Amino acid sequence: MKKTPLADTHEKLGARMVDFAGWYMPVQYIGLREEHNNVRTNVGLFDVSHMGEVRVKGPKALETLEWLTTNDVSKLNDGEAQYSLLPNDQGGLVDDIIVYCLSKDSDYLVCVNASNKDKDFAWMTKHNKGADITDESDLWGQIAIQGPKALELCDRVFDIKVSEMKSFTVKSGTFKGHKIMIATTGYTGEKGCEVFVEAAGTADLWMTLLEKGKDLGCMGIGLGARDTLRTEMKYSLYGHEIDDTTNPYEAGLGWVIKPAKKDFMNKAQIVGKKEAGLTRNLVGFKMLEKGIPRQGYSLFSFDNKEIGKVTSGTHSPTLDEPIGIAFIDVAYAKEGTEFLLDIRGRKVKAVVCKTPFVTK
């Protein structure tokens, strides 16, 4: 298993470690529910150093990223970021990503999913339009600082005034001599940021954040709570809501597809999927009867027709009830529509509901 720069730190602090996509990662510290609720009320730290970082530089950097991604990279100015997609040549998705503009037209950092890092790098290299593309994943650790008190903690630790940064921006600086990039992005629905730090400085930064945030209730958060937090927001996770066959419009990601820009990989087929009409939608749902939804469970109409599949499901710590995300036939996708969920041969009632499940 691969280890992040924080692996030894997690062990010393008593985290329960597991294999996650080939990485030795903390699934929880004191318990999923407590960690989840702490991020919703105080502040939590996430080790996201397993995520991949791909640098795209040079005179052809913008042209390359415009071709590789569905969103319009040309709109980004220095210090701005955007959520985007890497479309494949079959009408599905290689990955969902965040593009950070470090220097307009010529220097970008692309953050990719841990499980897709090698695949993404190979894809980007194969379809390069002449940029200098390098895998910088081993150079960086990454810590997400999330929660209502996250910005207060950041302002205590960093010279950069994070509380004054706009959402989806990035600034470069240093921490105890180590290069850092602070990005006001996240995966929880809370205020906060994600800090790229030179690998050698990651453990020191983690311990400093814990110490400086003690009175704010700061604690380490495992992958278990990271997943329940993102599920409550109906944020997509690759391998669940999206994969290499997903129609991005059906997944609710049409807002990051820009047909007006000159061209991108497989543009005609991707945009054509919307014009052809959608057959299913990605929706949130709640249970009306006892049961926890899990990925792969089938959805049925009341006349016993299979109408969809669960992509993610959990017991929501914030709402204290089971919630799920599913692809469902468009005829059943309207809020308030009831259906049956097959839980190991037992069919129980559920209802399509408004998302995100948790709002501030």
UniProtKB/Swiss-Prot annotation:
GO terms (BP aspect): glycine decarboxylation via glycine cleavage system
Query: Do you know which PANTHER family this protein is assigned to?
Result: AMINOMETHYLTRANSFERASE, AMINOMETHYLTRANSFERASE, MITOCHONDRIAL
Highest taxon in the source lineage: Bacteria
Which controlled-vocabulary keywords does the entry list? Aminotransferase, Transferase
In the Enzyme Commission scheme, what number(s) does this protein have?
2.1.2.10
Cite the GO molecular-function annotations of the record. aminomethyltransferase activity; transaminase activity
Protein's name in the database: Aminomethyltransferase
Q: Tell me what reaction this enzyme catalyses.
A: N(6)-[(R)-S(8)-aminomethyldihydrolipoyl]-L-lysyl-[protein] + (6S)-5,6,7,8-tetrahydrofolate = N(6)-[(R)-dihydrolipoyl]-L-lysyl-[protein] + (6R)-5,10-methylene-5,6,7,8-tetrahydrofolate + NH4(+)
Family indicated by similarity: Belongs to the GcvT family.
Question: Might you report a single GO cellular component term?
Answer: glycine cleavage complex
Q: Which InterPro entries match?
A: GCS_T, GCS_T_bac, GCST_C, GCV_T_N, GcvT/YgfZ/DmdA, GcvT/YgfZ_C, TrmE/GcvT_dom1
What is its quaternary makeup? The glycine cleavage system is composed of four proteins: P, T, L and H.
Its function, per the record, reads: The glycine cleavage system catalyzes the degradation of glycine.
